[in-house]
A protein has these predicted regions:
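Terminal (and in a subset, N-terminal) low-complexity or junction segments at the ends
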Residues: 1-96, 100, 104-187, 196-216, ...
Length: 536
Protein backbone atom coordinates (compact mmCIF):
# COMPACT_ATOMS: atom_id res chain seq x y z
CA UNK A 1 0.00 0.00 0.00
CA UNK A 2 2.85 2.39 0.85
CA UNK A 3 4.54 1.76 -2.52
CA UNK A 4 1.22 2.15 -4.29
CA UNK A 5 0.66 5.53 -2.61
CA UNK A 6 4.21 6.65 -3.46
CA UNK A 7 3.64 5.64 -7.06
CA UNK A 8 0.37 7.58 -7.21
CA UNK A 9 1.95 10.64 -5.57
CA UNK A 10 4.82 10.69 -8.06
CA UNK A 11 2.42 10.41 -11.00
CA UNK A 12 0.52 13.41 -9.59
CA UNK A 13 3.83 15.26 -9.20
CA UNK A 14 4.72 14.54 -12.81
CA UNK A 15 1.36 15.78 -14.08
CA UNK A 16 0.94 18.84 -11.87
CA UNK A 17 4.33 20.10 -10.71
CA UNK A 18 6.92 19.30 -13.40
CA UNK A 19 7.62 22.50 -15.33
CA UNK A 20 10.82 21.46 -17.09
CA UNK A 21 12.68 18.39 -18.34
CA UNK A 22 15.05 18.82 -15.38
CA UNK A 23 12.11 18.27 -13.01
CA UNK A 24 11.22 15.08 -14.89
CA UNK A 25 14.76 13.80 -14.41
CA UNK A 26 14.51 14.50 -10.68
CA UNK A 27 11.22 12.60 -10.33
CA UNK A 28 12.66 9.76 -12.42
CA UNK A 29 15.62 9.60 -10.02
CA UNK A 30 13.23 9.35 -7.06
CA UNK A 31 11.38 6.49 -8.77
CA UNK A 32 14.66 4.59 -9.15
CA UNK A 33 16.03 5.29 -5.65
CA UNK A 34 12.75 4.25 -4.00
CA UNK A 35 12.77 0.97 -5.90
CA UNK A 36 9.39 1.66 -7.49
CA UNK A 37 10.43 0.12 -10.83
CA UNK A 38 10.60 -3.27 -9.11
CA UNK A 39 6.89 -3.12 -8.29
CA UNK A 40 4.23 -5.01 -10.17
CA UNK A 41 4.84 -4.52 -13.94
CA UNK A 42 1.57 -2.63 -14.38
CA UNK A 43 2.52 -0.08 -11.68
CA UNK A 44 5.99 0.40 -13.15
CA UNK A 45 4.43 0.77 -16.58
CA UNK A 46 2.10 3.51 -15.30
CA UNK A 47 5.03 5.42 -13.83
CA UNK A 48 7.21 5.17 -16.93
CA UNK A 49 4.35 6.05 -19.25
CA UNK A 50 3.58 9.07 -17.06
CA UNK A 51 7.19 10.21 -17.53
CA UNK A 52 6.88 10.08 -21.32
CA UNK A 53 3.43 11.70 -21.25
CA UNK A 54 4.70 14.58 -19.09
CA UNK A 55 7.72 14.98 -21.35
CA UNK A 56 5.35 15.41 -24.32
CA UNK A 57 3.37 18.11 -22.52
CA UNK A 58 6.53 20.18 -21.95
CA UNK A 59 7.64 20.26 -25.58
CA UNK A 60 7.37 23.75 -27.16
CA UNK A 61 5.51 24.37 -30.45
CA UNK A 62 6.97 22.55 -33.45
CA UNK A 63 8.58 25.57 -35.24
CA UNK A 64 10.62 26.29 -32.08
CA UNK A 65 11.58 22.67 -31.50
CA UNK A 66 14.48 21.17 -33.44
CA UNK A 67 14.84 17.47 -32.59
CA UNK A 68 17.49 16.96 -29.93
CA UNK A 69 19.24 13.57 -29.68
CA UNK A 70 19.18 13.67 -25.86
CA UNK A 71 15.38 13.98 -25.92
CA UNK A 72 14.59 10.96 -28.01
CA UNK A 73 17.41 8.81 -26.57
CA UNK A 74 16.00 9.47 -23.11
CA UNK A 75 12.45 8.66 -24.25
CA UNK A 76 13.65 5.43 -25.86
CA UNK A 77 15.47 4.36 -22.70
CA UNK A 78 12.35 5.00 -20.59
CA UNK A 79 10.07 3.19 -23.03
CA UNK A 80 12.39 0.17 -23.21
CA UNK A 81 11.97 -0.34 -19.45
CA UNK A 82 8.26 -1.05 -19.93
CA UNK A 83 7.91 -4.83 -20.09
CA UNK A 84 4.52 -5.07 -21.81
CA UNK A 85 3.53 -1.67 -23.20
CA UNK A 86 -0.21 -1.09 -23.44
CA UNK A 87 -1.95 0.66 -26.32
CA UNK A 88 -1.75 3.90 -24.33
CA UNK A 89 2.02 3.43 -23.87
CA UNK A 90 2.53 2.91 -27.59
CA UNK A 91 0.34 5.90 -28.43
CA UNK A 92 2.37 8.06 -26.06
CA UNK A 93 5.76 7.17 -27.56
CA UNK A 94 4.42 7.52 -31.13
CA UNK A 95 3.09 10.96 -30.25
CA UNK A 96 6.46 11.89 -28.74
CA UNK A 97 8.15 11.46 -32.09
CA UNK A 98 5.53 13.40 -34.05
CA UNK A 99 5.99 16.23 -31.53
CA UNK A 100 9.77 16.02 -31.96
CA UNK A 101 9.35 16.16 -35.76
CA UNK A 102 10.80 12.66 -36.07
CA UNK A 103 8.06 11.03 -38.17
CA UNK A 104 10.22 8.10 -39.31
CA UNK A 105 10.67 7.06 -35.67
CA UNK A 106 6.94 7.42 -35.05
CA UNK A 107 6.18 5.03 -37.92
CA UNK A 108 8.86 2.62 -36.66
CA UNK A 109 7.18 2.40 -33.26
CA UNK A 110 3.78 1.93 -34.90
CA UNK A 111 5.15 -0.99 -36.92
CA UNK A 112 6.63 -2.51 -33.75
CA UNK A 113 3.29 -2.08 -32.02
CA UNK A 114 1.45 -3.97 -34.75
CA UNK A 115 4.11 -6.71 -34.85
CA UNK A 116 3.51 -7.30 -31.16
CA UNK A 117 -0.21 -7.60 -31.91
CA UNK A 118 -1.10 -4.68 -29.64
CA UNK A 119 -4.53 -3.44 -30.77
CA UNK A 120 -4.76 0.22 -31.87
CA UNK A 121 -7.45 2.55 -30.60
CA UNK A 122 -9.04 5.79 -31.81
CA UNK A 123 -5.97 7.78 -30.65
CA UNK A 124 -3.37 5.63 -32.42
CA UNK A 125 -4.27 6.46 -36.01
CA UNK A 126 -4.36 10.28 -35.67
CA UNK A 127 -0.81 10.23 -34.24
CA UNK A 128 0.43 7.92 -37.01
CA UNK A 129 -1.32 9.98 -39.69
CA UNK A 130 0.37 13.12 -38.37
CA UNK A 131 3.69 11.36 -38.99
CA UNK A 132 2.53 10.46 -42.51
CA UNK A 133 1.60 14.12 -43.11
CA UNK A 134 5.08 15.24 -42.01
CA UNK A 135 6.65 12.75 -44.45
CA UNK A 136 4.08 13.10 -47.26
CA UNK A 137 3.89 9.31 -46.97
CA UNK A 138 0.93 8.38 -49.17
CA UNK A 139 1.25 4.57 -49.20
CA UNK A 140 1.33 4.27 -45.40
CA UNK A 141 -1.62 6.65 -45.13
CA UNK A 142 -3.67 4.43 -47.44
CA UNK A 143 -2.79 1.43 -45.25
CA UNK A 144 -3.87 3.37 -42.16
CA UNK A 145 -7.14 4.24 -43.88
CA UNK A 146 -7.81 0.55 -44.55
CA UNK A 147 -7.00 -0.33 -40.93
CA UNK A 148 -9.24 2.50 -39.72
CA UNK A 149 -12.12 1.08 -41.74
CA UNK A 150 -11.38 -2.42 -40.43
CA UNK A 151 -11.37 -1.29 -36.79
CA UNK A 152 -14.35 1.03 -37.22
CA UNK A 153 -12.50 4.31 -36.62
CA UNK A 154 -13.47 6.15 -39.82
CA UNK A 155 -16.35 7.70 -37.89
CA UNK A 156 -13.80 9.40 -35.62
CA UNK A 157 -13.38 13.08 -36.54
CA UNK A 158 -9.68 13.12 -35.55
CA UNK A 159 -8.88 10.17 -37.80
CA UNK A 160 -10.72 11.75 -40.75
CA UNK A 161 -9.15 15.18 -40.23
CA UNK A 162 -5.62 13.80 -40.17
CA UNK A 163 -6.28 11.56 -43.16
CA UNK A 164 -7.54 14.59 -45.12
CA UNK A 165 -4.38 16.47 -44.12
CA UNK A 166 -2.12 13.69 -45.43
CA UNK A 167 -3.91 13.55 -48.77
CA UNK A 168 -3.76 17.35 -49.10
CA UNK A 169 -0.03 17.38 -48.31
CA UNK A 170 0.53 14.70 -50.96
CA UNK A 171 -1.40 16.68 -53.57
CA UNK A 172 -4.25 14.15 -53.63
CA UNK A 173 -6.97 16.74 -53.17
CA UNK A 174 -9.61 14.49 -54.77
CA UNK A 175 -8.97 11.73 -52.22
CA UNK A 176 -8.92 14.33 -49.46
CA UNK A 177 -12.29 15.74 -50.44
CA UNK A 178 -13.77 12.24 -50.69
CA UNK A 179 -12.80 11.52 -47.07
CA UNK A 180 -14.10 14.95 -46.02
CA UNK A 181 -17.36 14.53 -47.94
CA UNK A 182 -18.00 11.06 -46.50
CA UNK A 183 -17.10 11.95 -42.91
CA UNK A 184 -19.96 11.51 -40.46
CA UNK A 185 -18.82 14.24 -38.08
CA UNK A 186 -17.13 17.55 -38.94
CA UNK A 187 -15.65 20.25 -36.78
CA UNK A 188 -13.89 23.53 -37.56
CA UNK A 189 -10.61 21.66 -38.15
CA UNK A 190 -12.32 19.45 -40.76
CA UNK A 191 -13.32 22.48 -42.81
CA UNK A 192 -10.04 24.33 -42.28
CA UNK A 193 -7.91 21.37 -43.41
CA UNK A 194 -9.78 20.80 -46.68
CA UNK A 195 -10.00 24.57 -47.25
CA UNK A 196 -6.22 24.84 -46.84
CA UNK A 197 -5.78 21.93 -49.25
CA UNK A 198 -7.81 23.62 -51.96
CA UNK A 199 -5.99 26.92 -51.42
CA UNK A 200 -2.55 25.30 -51.63
CA UNK A 201 -3.70 23.49 -54.76
CA UNK A 202 -4.81 26.88 -56.15
CA UNK A 203 -8.37 25.59 -56.59
CA UNK A 204 -9.80 28.82 -55.29
CA UNK A 205 -13.36 28.32 -56.57
CA UNK A 206 -13.68 24.96 -54.80
CA UNK A 207 -12.19 26.53 -51.69
CA UNK A 208 -14.86 29.23 -51.78
CA UNK A 209 -17.53 26.56 -52.23
CA UNK A 210 -16.37 24.81 -49.03
CA UNK A 211 -16.17 28.19 -47.27
CA UNK A 212 -19.75 29.06 -48.24
CA UNK A 213 -21.02 25.62 -47.18
CA UNK A 214 -19.38 26.01 -43.78
CA UNK A 215 -21.79 27.27 -41.08
CA UNK A 216 -20.95 30.88 -40.19
CA UNK A 217 -20.96 29.99 -36.49
CA UNK A 218 -18.24 27.37 -37.09
CA UNK A 219 -15.82 29.63 -38.98
CA UNK A 220 -12.87 30.90 -36.97
CA UNK A 221 -10.00 33.31 -37.65
CA UNK A 222 -8.04 30.53 -39.38
CA UNK A 223 -10.95 29.88 -41.76
CA UNK A 224 -11.17 33.52 -42.85
CA UNK A 225 -7.39 33.89 -42.96
CA UNK A 226 -6.99 30.85 -45.20
CA UNK A 227 -9.63 32.09 -47.63
CA UNK A 228 -8.13 35.58 -47.74
CA UNK A 229 -4.65 34.12 -48.30
CA UNK A 230 -6.03 31.99 -51.13
CA UNK A 231 -7.45 35.02 -52.90
CA UNK A 232 -4.24 37.02 -52.41
CA UNK A 233 -1.99 34.18 -53.60
CA UNK A 234 -4.08 33.58 -56.74
CA UNK A 235 -4.20 37.33 -57.50
CA UNK A 236 -7.94 37.64 -56.90
CA UNK A 237 -7.30 40.86 -55.04
CA UNK A 238 -10.78 42.35 -55.44
CA UNK A 239 -12.37 39.19 -53.97
CA UNK A 240 -9.86 39.32 -51.13
CA UNK A 241 -10.86 42.86 -50.22
CA UNK A 242 -14.56 42.07 -50.63
CA UNK A 243 -14.25 39.14 -48.22
CA UNK A 244 -12.35 41.35 -45.80
CA UNK A 245 -15.26 43.80 -45.84
CA UNK A 246 -17.53 40.91 -44.83
CA UNK A 247 -15.18 40.17 -41.93
CA UNK A 248 -15.54 43.74 -40.72
CA UNK A 249 -19.34 43.61 -40.92
CA UNK A 250 -19.40 40.36 -38.92
CA UNK A 251 -16.75 41.64 -36.44
CA UNK A 252 -14.58 38.58 -37.06
CA UNK A 253 -11.26 38.72 -35.13
CA UNK A 254 -8.22 39.25 -37.36
CA UNK A 255 -5.16 37.04 -37.26
CA UNK A 256 -1.79 37.86 -38.81
CA UNK A 257 -2.49 35.75 -41.91
CA UNK A 258 -5.64 37.78 -42.61
CA UNK A 259 -3.87 41.09 -42.10
CA UNK A 260 -0.92 40.18 -44.31
CA UNK A 261 -3.20 38.92 -47.10
CA UNK A 262 -5.33 42.07 -47.04
CA UNK A 263 -2.28 44.34 -47.02
CA UNK A 264 -0.91 42.42 -50.01
CA UNK A 265 -4.19 42.91 -51.90
CA UNK A 266 -4.29 46.60 -50.97
CA UNK A 267 -0.75 47.06 -52.26
CA UNK A 268 -1.52 45.34 -55.55
CA UNK A 269 -4.75 47.29 -56.04
CA UNK A 270 -3.33 50.62 -54.92
CA UNK A 271 -5.90 50.78 -52.10
CA UNK A 272 -3.89 53.14 -49.91
CA UNK A 273 -6.76 54.29 -47.69
CA UNK A 274 -8.06 50.79 -47.03
CA UNK A 275 -4.55 49.61 -46.21
CA UNK A 276 -4.13 52.52 -43.81
CA UNK A 277 -7.30 51.44 -42.02
CA UNK A 278 -5.82 47.95 -41.63
CA UNK A 279 -2.68 49.54 -40.18
CA UNK A 280 -4.85 51.57 -37.79
CA UNK A 281 -6.50 48.33 -36.67
CA UNK A 282 -3.04 46.90 -35.90
CA UNK A 283 -2.28 49.94 -33.74
CA UNK A 284 -5.65 49.96 -31.95
CA UNK A 285 -5.45 46.25 -31.24
CA UNK A 286 -1.85 46.65 -30.03
CA UNK A 287 -0.76 43.81 -32.27
CA UNK A 288 3.00 43.36 -32.07
CA UNK A 289 4.61 44.06 -35.44
CA UNK A 290 6.85 41.04 -35.93
CA UNK A 291 8.98 40.43 -39.03
CA UNK A 292 5.93 38.90 -40.74
CA UNK A 293 3.77 42.03 -40.33
CA UNK A 294 6.72 44.37 -40.84
CA UNK A 295 7.35 42.85 -44.26
CA UNK A 296 3.68 43.16 -45.22
CA UNK A 297 3.41 46.80 -44.11
CA UNK A 298 6.66 47.83 -45.80
CA UNK A 299 5.62 46.07 -49.00
CA UNK A 300 2.16 47.69 -48.93
CA UNK A 301 3.32 51.26 -48.35
CA UNK A 302 6.16 50.90 -50.86
CA UNK A 303 3.82 49.62 -53.57
CA UNK A 304 1.48 52.56 -52.90
CA UNK A 305 4.37 55.03 -53.19
CA UNK A 306 4.55 55.97 -49.49
CA UNK A 307 8.27 55.33 -49.23
CA UNK A 308 8.81 57.48 -46.13
CA UNK A 309 6.12 55.59 -44.20
CA UNK A 310 7.61 52.28 -45.36
CA UNK A 311 11.03 53.43 -44.15
CA UNK A 312 9.64 54.49 -40.77
CA UNK A 313 8.02 51.09 -40.17
CA UNK A 314 11.13 49.26 -41.33
CA UNK A 315 13.50 51.28 -39.16
CA UNK A 316 11.24 50.93 -36.09
CA UNK A 317 11.07 47.16 -36.36
CA UNK A 318 13.59 45.38 -34.11
CA UNK A 319 13.00 42.07 -35.90
CA UNK A 320 14.16 42.49 -39.49
CA UNK A 321 14.55 39.22 -41.37
CA UNK A 322 15.54 38.67 -45.00
CA UNK A 323 11.96 39.14 -46.22
CA UNK A 324 11.64 42.53 -44.52
CA UNK A 325 14.93 43.70 -46.03
CA UNK A 326 13.84 42.48 -49.46
CA UNK A 327 10.51 44.30 -49.19
CA UNK A 328 12.33 47.54 -48.40
CA UNK A 329 14.86 47.08 -51.21
CA UNK A 330 12.25 46.16 -53.82
CA UNK A 331 10.09 49.12 -52.74
CA UNK A 332 12.99 51.51 -53.24
CA UNK A 333 13.79 49.88 -56.58
CA UNK A 334 10.22 50.30 -57.85
CA UNK A 335 10.35 54.05 -57.27
CA UNK A 336 13.87 54.68 -58.57
CA UNK A 337 15.66 55.38 -55.27
CA UNK A 338 18.88 53.81 -56.50
CA UNK A 339 21.40 55.46 -54.17
CA UNK A 340 19.20 54.90 -51.12
CA UNK A 341 18.71 51.28 -52.16
CA UNK A 342 22.47 50.70 -52.28
CA UNK A 343 22.83 52.23 -48.81
CA UNK A 344 20.20 49.85 -47.46
CA UNK A 345 21.92 46.94 -49.17
CA UNK A 346 25.18 47.88 -47.44
CA UNK A 347 23.35 48.03 -44.09
CA UNK A 348 21.85 44.63 -44.77
CA UNK A 349 25.26 43.09 -45.39
CA UNK A 350 26.71 44.79 -42.29
CA UNK A 351 23.86 43.32 -40.24
CA UNK A 352 24.94 39.88 -41.52
CA UNK A 353 21.67 39.20 -43.29
CA UNK A 354 22.58 36.95 -46.23
CA UNK A 355 21.04 38.22 -49.49
CA UNK A 356 19.20 35.90 -51.87
CA UNK A 357 18.03 36.01 -55.47
CA UNK A 358 15.14 38.38 -54.67
CA UNK A 359 17.56 40.78 -52.99
CA UNK A 360 19.71 41.04 -56.09
CA UNK A 361 16.67 41.31 -58.32
CA UNK A 362 15.63 44.41 -56.37
CA UNK A 363 19.16 45.80 -56.41
CA UNK A 364 19.57 45.34 -60.17
CA UNK A 365 16.13 46.78 -60.94
CA UNK A 366 16.90 49.78 -58.73
CA UNK A 367 20.24 50.33 -60.44
CA UNK A 368 18.54 50.02 -63.83
CA UNK A 369 15.91 52.65 -63.01
CA UNK A 370 18.52 55.00 -61.56
CA UNK A 371 21.08 54.40 -64.34
CA UNK A 372 23.73 53.12 -61.92
CA UNK A 373 25.56 51.01 -64.48
CA UNK A 374 28.93 50.54 -62.76
CA UNK A 375 27.34 49.62 -59.42
CA UNK A 376 25.09 47.09 -61.16
CA UNK A 377 28.04 45.56 -63.02
CA UNK A 378 30.00 45.18 -59.77
CA UNK A 379 27.16 43.63 -57.76
CA UNK A 380 26.11 41.37 -60.62
CA UNK A 381 29.68 40.09 -60.81
CA UNK A 382 29.82 39.56 -57.03
CA UNK A 383 26.57 37.59 -56.79
CA UNK A 384 28.20 34.18 -56.94
CA UNK A 385 31.79 34.89 -55.95
CA UNK A 386 31.12 37.05 -52.87
CA UNK A 387 27.55 36.31 -51.78
CA UNK A 388 27.08 32.75 -53.02
CA UNK A 389 23.85 33.58 -54.87
CA UNK A 390 23.42 31.81 -58.24
CA UNK A 391 22.49 33.96 -61.22
CA UNK A 392 19.09 33.18 -62.69
CA UNK A 393 17.44 34.23 -65.93
CA UNK A 394 15.63 37.09 -64.21
CA UNK A 395 18.99 38.55 -63.06
CA UNK A 396 20.40 38.35 -66.58
CA UNK A 397 17.17 39.96 -67.81
CA UNK A 398 17.66 42.89 -65.43
CA UNK A 399 21.24 43.37 -66.59
CA UNK A 400 20.18 43.14 -70.22
CA UNK A 401 17.54 45.80 -69.55
CA UNK A 402 20.03 48.07 -67.76
CA UNK A 403 22.73 47.78 -70.42
CA UNK A 404 20.31 48.11 -73.33
CA UNK A 405 18.61 51.17 -71.80
CA UNK A 406 22.05 52.77 -71.46
CA UNK A 407 22.78 52.14 -75.13
CA UNK A 408 25.32 49.41 -74.41
CA UNK A 409 23.65 47.11 -76.92
CA UNK A 410 26.80 45.21 -77.87
CA UNK A 411 27.69 44.48 -74.22
CA UNK A 412 24.13 43.33 -73.53
CA UNK A 413 24.19 41.04 -76.56
CA UNK A 414 27.54 39.53 -75.56
CA UNK A 415 26.28 38.89 -72.03
CA UNK A 416 23.14 37.13 -73.31
CA UNK A 417 25.14 34.96 -75.71
CA UNK A 418 27.54 33.95 -72.91
CA UNK A 419 24.78 32.93 -70.46
CA UNK A 420 24.91 29.31 -69.22
CA UNK A 421 21.22 28.93 -70.12
CA UNK A 422 19.02 29.93 -73.06
CA UNK A 423 17.43 33.35 -72.89
CA UNK A 424 13.69 33.70 -72.35
CA UNK A 425 11.20 36.30 -73.58
CA UNK A 426 12.10 38.66 -70.72
CA UNK A 427 15.83 38.60 -71.53
CA UNK A 428 15.43 39.06 -75.28
CA UNK A 429 12.56 41.51 -74.75
CA UNK A 430 14.80 43.69 -72.58
CA UNK A 431 17.37 43.77 -75.36
CA UNK A 432 14.68 44.53 -77.94
CA UNK A 433 13.38 47.42 -75.81
CA UNK A 434 16.85 48.95 -75.70
CA UNK A 435 17.22 48.54 -79.44
CA UNK A 436 13.97 50.45 -80.00
CA UNK A 437 15.17 53.20 -77.67
CA UNK A 438 18.51 53.57 -79.45
CA UNK A 439 17.51 52.62 -83.00
CA UNK A 440 19.68 49.51 -83.36
CA UNK A 441 17.80 47.68 -86.12
CA UNK A 442 20.34 44.89 -86.69
CA UNK A 443 20.38 43.59 -83.10
CA UNK A 444 16.63 44.21 -82.79
CA UNK A 445 16.00 41.80 -85.67
CA UNK A 446 18.05 39.09 -83.93
CA UNK A 447 16.25 39.62 -80.62
CA UNK A 448 12.84 39.64 -82.33
CA UNK A 449 13.62 36.39 -84.16
CA UNK A 450 14.47 34.69 -80.86
CA UNK A 451 11.28 35.96 -79.20
CA UNK A 452 9.19 34.66 -82.13
CA UNK A 453 10.82 31.24 -81.70
CA UNK A 454 10.20 31.12 -77.95
CA UNK A 455 6.72 32.67 -77.92
CA UNK A 456 5.07 32.64 -81.37
CA UNK A 457 1.81 34.01 -79.96
CA UNK A 458 3.48 37.15 -78.56
CA UNK A 459 1.96 40.04 -80.50
CA UNK A 460 4.03 42.71 -78.78
CA UNK A 461 7.23 41.84 -80.69
CA UNK A 462 5.58 42.65 -84.04
CA UNK A 463 4.42 46.05 -82.77
CA UNK A 464 7.88 46.82 -81.40
CA UNK A 465 9.58 45.89 -84.68
CA UNK A 466 7.02 47.97 -86.57
CA UNK A 467 7.97 50.98 -84.42
CA UNK A 468 11.69 50.34 -84.95
CA UNK A 469 11.28 50.09 -88.75
CA UNK A 470 9.09 53.19 -88.82
CA UNK A 471 11.64 55.22 -86.83
CA UNK A 472 14.38 54.03 -89.20
CA UNK A 473 12.14 54.88 -92.20
CA UNK A 474 12.42 51.32 -93.49
CA UNK A 475 8.94 51.25 -94.93
CA UNK A 476 9.32 47.99 -96.86
CA UNK A 477 10.37 46.16 -93.69
CA UNK A 478 7.48 47.79 -91.83
CA UNK A 479 5.05 46.41 -94.41
CA UNK A 480 6.66 42.96 -94.22
CA UNK A 481 6.44 42.71 -90.42
CA UNK A 482 2.78 43.70 -90.47
CA UNK A 483 2.02 41.15 -93.18
CA UNK A 484 3.91 38.50 -91.21
CA UNK A 485 1.86 39.32 -88.13
CA UNK A 486 -1.39 39.10 -90.08
CA UNK A 487 -0.41 35.84 -91.80
CA UNK A 488 0.32 34.26 -88.44
CA UNK A 489 -2.94 35.67 -87.06
CA UNK A 490 -1.16 37.10 -84.05
CA UNK A 491 -2.94 39.77 -82.06
CA UNK A 492 -1.40 42.13 -79.58
CA UNK A 493 -2.77 41.66 -76.09
CA UNK A 494 -4.66 44.71 -74.94
CA UNK A 495 -3.06 46.39 -71.96
CA UNK A 496 -5.28 47.23 -69.01
CA UNK A 497 -5.16 49.97 -66.41
CA UNK A 498 -6.67 50.54 -62.98
CA UNK A 499 -8.30 53.70 -61.68
CA UNK A 500 -10.21 54.60 -58.51
CA UNK A 501 -13.52 56.49 -58.54
CA UNK A 502 -15.25 57.20 -55.23
CA UNK A 503 -13.13 54.59 -53.50
CA UNK A 504 -13.95 51.84 -56.02
CA UNK A 505 -11.22 50.39 -58.27
CA UNK A 506 -12.12 49.91 -61.96
CA UNK A 507 -10.15 48.01 -64.62
CA UNK A 508 -10.31 49.14 -68.27
CA UNK A 509 -8.43 48.88 -71.57
CA UNK A 510 -7.45 51.54 -74.08
CA UNK A 511 -10.39 52.69 -76.21
CA UNK A 512 -12.92 51.00 -73.92
CA UNK A 513 -16.28 52.75 -74.37
CA UNK A 514 -18.41 49.82 -73.15
CA UNK A 515 -17.34 50.14 -69.53
CA UNK A 516 -20.27 51.37 -67.38
CA UNK A 517 -18.05 54.10 -65.90
CA UNK A 518 -16.28 55.04 -69.16
CA UNK A 519 -17.32 58.73 -69.06
CA UNK A 520 -16.01 59.22 -65.52
CA UNK A 521 -12.82 57.27 -66.31
CA UNK A 522 -11.95 59.44 -69.30
CA UNK A 523 -12.66 62.63 -67.33
CA UNK A 524 -10.12 61.52 -64.72
CA UNK A 525 -7.60 60.51 -67.41
CA UNK A 526 -7.96 63.90 -69.10
CA UNK A 527 -7.35 65.63 -65.76
CA UNK A 528 -4.22 63.51 -65.24
CA UNK A 529 -3.01 64.40 -68.73
CA UNK A 530 -3.53 68.13 -68.14
CA UNK A 531 -1.69 67.90 -64.82
CA UNK A 532 1.25 66.14 -66.48
CA UNK A 533 1.35 68.79 -69.22
CA UNK A 534 1.39 71.62 -66.64
CA UNK A 535 4.17 69.87 -64.71
CA UNK A 536 6.22 69.55 -67.88
Amino acid sequence: MIYCKQSTDLICTLKNQCKSVKHIYQVHAQIITRGLLSLHPSSASRLLTAIIHTFNSLLPPAPQRPPHPISYHYLHSVFNLISSPSTFCWNTIIRSHTLLSLPENALFFFIQMRRRCVPPDAHTFPFVLKACAQLNELSVARTIQCQSIKHGFMRDVFVCNNLVRVYCNCGRIGDAYKVFDESVERDVVSYNVILDGFVKGREIERARQVFDEMPVSVRDATTWGTMLAGYAQTKHYDQCLSLYDQMLVLSVPHDNVSIVSVLSACGRMGELEKGKRVHDHIRRSRIQIDSFLCTALVDFYAKCGSIETAQGIFEASPDKNLFAWNAMLVGLAMHGYGEMLLNYFSKMVKNRVKPDGVTFLGVLVGCSHAGLINEARRLFGEMGSVYGVPKELKHYGCMADLLARAGLIKEAMEMIESMPMSGDVFVWGSLLGGCRLHGNVEVAEKAAARIMEISPEDGGVYSTMADIYANAKRWDDLTKIRRLRDSRKVKKNAGCSLIQLDGVTYEFIAGDDLHPQSNEIYLVLNAIGQHQYQMG
